[in-house]
């Protein structure tokens, strides 16, 4: 990764390590954008949703807010460029949750072993079908994942994994995304970990309404900042909160 400079929200020039990395998966490589702000307290790996990629404006925005909170990010493409073209035509790969989960797990292990990770705690952020992969990966990796956030996710697609998740999990949905609200409420009942369902007033599935994505980003940053701290993870109390 390369050392670069940028101004933080206070206008101060700070050092950031960033770059495009190639993560080996089976006989191919997946591309990811890895950014580590100064004195990062953890790393969040993004699993993008249906028809999306690491260039997603929404996930890029969420990632920038995490950087301001001192959290590194890995925006991962779970499909190769060739697969993305095929998926754009038939939409099948984006719903292959088992494949996406296996690739995400491989990416987590690769990041863990990378010298730049510095043994930082790892969280997962998933959107749409990527949220199902994040939840499934968290259930399989167990204590190696310190927190999960789902944005407009489809946790129902990882139904058999829900009760095995141990990482604190935040489900964020838009109030006007009726079907996804219902699916997330049902999924929340099957989670046995510390969990929270946050419903953003007036928001639809893509959180395009004024202030909606900012609220999502703030919630995600707060969740990861709290739960990626090792001392917090050791004293979690299992409970459920629903917020509107």
Language model features: what each stretch is:
Residues 178-183:
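Conserved alpha/beta-hydrolase "acid-adjacent" motif
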